[in-house]
């Protein structure tokens, strides 16, 4: 996803910017909004094609861009209210954002705090942790070109590194924003033996022709094994797995021509490691996260990803996982 030479976010992704904010009070309903959004998409890509035509451009949008500045303002209200209730005046308002895209959320939050509570604004520090060098440069460019750059520059720090390479210890209370980030973290593919219930971890082999081949191994790597142990120990109620109930397994095992293994389950091992980072280096953090609760057109499996690309302004889904080029997994 972030490889500097061929990664999705480093080389292929373009974040949609709709131009002027939508006037939602004048939009009649959902279908009208989607019609207007389609028009903005067309206009945006037309402008891009004037200077850099690209049939394979990977264009995507975020709630921050679609609902600006209101989305950022709503988050800013929450941050300021909680800061003043529990931390003010003994601590500064320190905000970390991971995966900041164009930097729009940062600008909307800082604009709102400056305009509504200048005393808090003077004590606000906004730090972006951005793994992609190209996006970090874009965030700084957008900040410098903002009409409020002169005021905001002293409040912003853009740190171009992976959160998983983080090593500074941050003892101060802080808010940590992760909006539509978790779905981009890597997951491990696990399938189970219907007879024994034992898990197997998926891997990929690349042959001499560059073709991908999937295989499964009974020996789990330490990270996947730890996730399964932690989930089992921490779960307060039953959680879904591809195995299903023992009763249903015993019935299906007696039926003829049944597959030996389940459909894969995609476990969020990288998310677990992110929580380790928060625990080890941001002990006084407060996490604010948002993400998808479901994905359309996902490939088969539990918690399965969407694998797709974009070609000639159309989204093209792929029914299997091992697709290389511009796919987003």
Predicted features, each with a name:
Residues 100-101, 181:
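Beta-hairpin (beta-strand-turn-beta-strand) motif
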Residues 1-96, 102-173, 190:
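Rossmann-like AdoMet
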Residues 171-329:
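Class I S-adenosyl-L-methionine
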């Amino acid at each position: 996803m972030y490889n500097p030479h061929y990664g999705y976010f480093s080389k292929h992704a373009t974040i949609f910017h709709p131009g002027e904010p939508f006037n939602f009070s004048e939009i009649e309903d959902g279908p009208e909004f989607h019609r207007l959004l389609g028009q903005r998409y067309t206009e945006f890509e037309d402008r891009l094609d004037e200077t850099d035509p690209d049939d394979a451009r990977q264009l995507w949008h975020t709630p921050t861009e679609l609902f600006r500045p209101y989305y950022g303002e709503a988050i800013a209200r929450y941050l300021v209210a909680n800061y003043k209730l529990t931390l003010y005046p003994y601590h500064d308002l320190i905000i970390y954002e991971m995966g900041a895209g164009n930097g729009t959320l940062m600008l909307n939050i800082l604009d709102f705090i400056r305009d509504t509570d200048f005393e808090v604004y003077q004590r606000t520090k906004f730090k972006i942790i951005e793994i992609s060098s190209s996006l970090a440069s874009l965030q700084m460019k957008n900040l410098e070109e903002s009409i409020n750059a002169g005021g905001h520059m002293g409040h912003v720090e853009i740190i171009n590194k992976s959160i998983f390479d983080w090593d500074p210890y941050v003892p101060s209370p802080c808010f940590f924003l992760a909006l539509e980030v978790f779905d981009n973290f890597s997951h491990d593919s696990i399938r189970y033996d219907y007879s024994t219930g034992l898990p197997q971890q998926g891997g990929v082999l690349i042959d001499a022709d560059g073709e991908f081949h999937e295989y499964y191994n009974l020996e789990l790597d330490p990270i996947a094994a730890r996730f399964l142990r932690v989930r089992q120990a921490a779960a307060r109620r039953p959680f879904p797995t591809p195995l299903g109930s023992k009763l249903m397994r015993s019935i299906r095992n007696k039926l003829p021509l049944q597959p030996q293994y389940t459909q894969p389950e995609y476990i969020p091992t990288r998310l677990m490691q992110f929580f380790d980072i928060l625990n080890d280096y941001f002990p006084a953090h407060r996490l604010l996260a948002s993400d998808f609760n479901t994905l359309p057109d996902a490939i088969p499996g539990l918690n399965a990803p969407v694998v797709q690309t974009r070609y000639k302004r159309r989204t093209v889904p792929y029914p299997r996982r091992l697709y290389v080029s511009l796919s987003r997994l």
